Regions:
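Short glycine/proline-enriched loop/turn "hinge" motifs that connect secondary-structure elements
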Residues: 23-24, 240-244, 374-382
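Active-site region of PLP-dependent enzymes
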Residues: 170-176, 183-302
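Conserved PLP cofactor-binding pocket of PLP-dependent enzymes
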Residues: 223-232, 278, 319-387, 416-429
């Protein structure tokens, strides 16, 4: 095998081989142009059509378009009756919105460590984290792999807790044949640039519970009870926000939704090619898909086995050297999150709104502690991971997946020679 590109060898991935995501087709253009020629560009019929079509595709009774997945998460927390001082359990490793949505409604996040193999919340650690103030559990189907929902739902029903699915990355992922977003009490999806369903920006709130749907709709539009498509009385019946989606971007999302199943199939085909190519690579921990789960492969996230490489220094130093080596091969890998959630300043400072609120709220009790050392598996993952999104998606085929595999192999097989490693800690060649 040739030398890594970072050491002077040829690139595994030729320039121009990786295309932009998402692919744009004539139907997308037709929908968008038709919207531009309409009389309204705010929330309107295009949003309602996307709601109907997405609900049918995902198997939900109710769907509400939002301007982001973050907005949909806040709506979920509020609609589930979470209030001041309540506790909501959430994974210690995710995007910040998975936990800050709890603070948005004056409640307190309680973090739970991950299962290192799945990178998702460890269901076996959930029950120990429940307190008398716990009101809900947010499960994040991270990088497109579902959480073990049988275990989560059993715990939730035992303790009378609501379950919110953060499915922002998991469109089309399955758990024992059931789609994510259709197993808990409600769920949030994101449609931003990188997601498997892209409308530029935006999101979707979904539920099968009419009471929860009505509560979410109030939060969504100024505390009102009627949508902009109905005769509004412009009366705020509750505290509300403005989380509505505009009328243009849903048209793009509708066009993309017609190809979602095709996109997912392509990602799964390409990932199978890549996993076969990476079998037996020393020091590489590839992502898992347990029996009964169907991944959507939103983010192909790998970890590095430092012990297997003989590396005794800081894990992030070796991770960064390997990542830079793969980038030099033309493969756009990167770090997804540099900090676990409990280590982020907003939680360490416990001062979201000033004066220590909401942690200092008079309605709060059993104030959680956010010591990062309590979440060793999340920290280990954070320090050793790198991932990628677009190379395994449409319009790419097996040739791109094979080039990615070659890039990984070249770099891992020459890990001891990579630049950026201190000589005194550089692993010996096996």
């Amino acid at each position: 095998m040739a030398e890594p590109a970072i050491l002077g060898g040829p690139k595994a991935m030729p320039d121009g081989m990786i295309k932009a995501w998402p692919p744009i087709y004539d139907l997308d253009r037709q929908y968008v142009l038709a919207s531009l020629e309409s009389d309204s560009h705010a929330f309107g019929p295009n949003c309602a059509k996307l709601e109907e079509e997405f609900a049918a595709w995902n198997g939900n009774k109710f769907a509400i378009t939002t301007n982001s997945g973050t907005a949909a998460l806040h709506m979920a927390v509020a609609a589930c009756g979470v209030g001041a001082g309540d506790h909501v359990l959430v994974t210690a490793y995710s995007w910040s919105s998975s936990a800050t949505c709890i603070i948005h409604h004056n409640a307190l996040p309680v973090f739970v460590d991950i299962d290192f193999n799945t990178i998702n919340i460890d269901p076996d650690k959930i029950e120990a984290a429940i307190t008398p103030r716990t009101k809900a559990i947010i499960v994040v189907h991270l990088h497109g792999l579902a959480v073990d929902m049988d275990k989560v739902m059993a715990i939730a029903r035992k303790h009378n807790l609501k379950v919110i699915e953060d499915a922002c990355q998991a469109h089309g992922a399955l758990f024992h044949g059931k789609r994510v977003g259709a197993m808990g009490d409600c769920a949030a999806f994101s449609f931003n640039q990188n997601k498997c369903l892209c409308s530029g920006e935006g999101g979707m709130f979904v539920t099968d519970n009419e009471e929860i749907a009505n509560a979410a709709r109030q939060i969504w539009s100024f505390g009102e009870t009627r949508t902009p498509l109905e005769k509004r009385d412009y009366h705020a019946y509750a505290l509300g926000w403005m989380y509505r989606k505009n009328g243009l971007t849903p048209t793009f999302g509708r066009g993309q939704l017609t190809r979602m199943d095709e996109y997912l199939a392509r990602s799964r085909e390409n990932t199978a090619v890549l996993l076969k190519s990476l079998a037996g690579v020393k020091g590489l921990i590839v992502p898992t898909q347990p029996e009964g789960f169907l991944h959507n492969w939103y983010n192909f996230t790998s970890r590095i086995d430092m012990e297997a490489l003989g590396w005794t220094g800081e894990p992030a130093v070796m991770r960064d050297a390997i990542m830079q080596g793969i980038q030099a091969e033309g493969v756009p890998v990167g770090i997804w999150q540099s900090y676990i959630l409990p280590a982020m300043t907003v939680f360490q400072a416990k001062n979201a709104y000033g004066f220590g609120c909401p942690w200092s709220c008079q309605h709060g009790s059993d104030i959680p502690e956010y010591d990062p050392a309590q979440f060793p598996k999340a920290q280990r993952h954070c320090d050793t991971h790198f991932g990628m999104t677009s190379p395994l998606r449409a319009p790419h085929g097996a040739d791109v997946a094979e080039a990615v595999g070659e890039a990984f192999r070249k770099v891992f097989e020459n890990a001891e020679k990579l630049p950026g490693l201190p000589d005194r800690e550089r692993p010996a060649r096996a």
